[in-house]
């Protein structure tokens, strides 16, 4: 059972930070295009990266192109599409590709099927596909059955469940493998990994971080193998503030003991 996260890592410690985006750094919206990461949060991430030799990466189901757009004007190491594409600290990209015929056939099948499922949405990511049903939860079972059919017919693909989404991605790619790859490279190598995420897609990352003796943090409710928990996206934002400004947080704790309003509720 994950414990509430009440102690922030010391800014001077030897950590490598990994953050999911949707539901972790940004509030989930009805449509992915509506999601925004507040500029202040991006500044905190950039500051945290600077204090850790650049050892901070975004790990997401989104494409790297989307992640860069959401992180502007900052540029971080990234793992997109659950690790199917990755960019290291030097800007070198590592991309898992599928045969063009497979991508074409799968996309055609998905598009033709979703026509009969109003309210659902297909997001094509090149080497992966996301079947969204946030606006049509009654079609969850149908999308799951469709994804299972696809992964059975094309064994190089695997199914990944998420919040109001069923994803089809290259087999063997997940956020845990992406984090493990970063941890083999400078500036991440030799550091203690910290991973913050909110979804089923983040569980593989929690497993890798736990095995490495790091800090795994689940955002929100639900069963998890993460060791720690933050209740909401605003709690993640406050936690980032605490990490970046530990002296300010100490003053907050002193004020709390003196009976003043606390900076934030216990997280």
UniProtKB/Swiss-Prot annotation:
Ligand binding (substrate): 20-22
Residues the entry annotates as binding Mg(2+): 20, 22, 198
One GO term of the biological process aspect: trehalose biosynthetic process
Disulfide bond sites: none
The keyword Nuclease belongs to this UniProt entry's keyword annotation: no
A single MF term (Gene Ontology): magnesium ion binding
Active site (catalytic residues): 20
Domain of life: Bacteria
Cofactors that this protein relies on: Mg(2+)
Pathway entry: Glycan biosynthesis; trehalose biosynthesis
Stated role: Removes the phosphate from trehalose 6-phosphate to produce free trehalose.
NCBIfam families (UniProt xref): HAD-SF-IIB, PRK10187.1, T6PP
Family indicated by similarity: Belongs to the trehalose phosphatase family.
Name this protein carries in UniProt: Trehalose-phosphate phosphatase
Natural source organism: Salmonella typhimurium (strain SL1344)
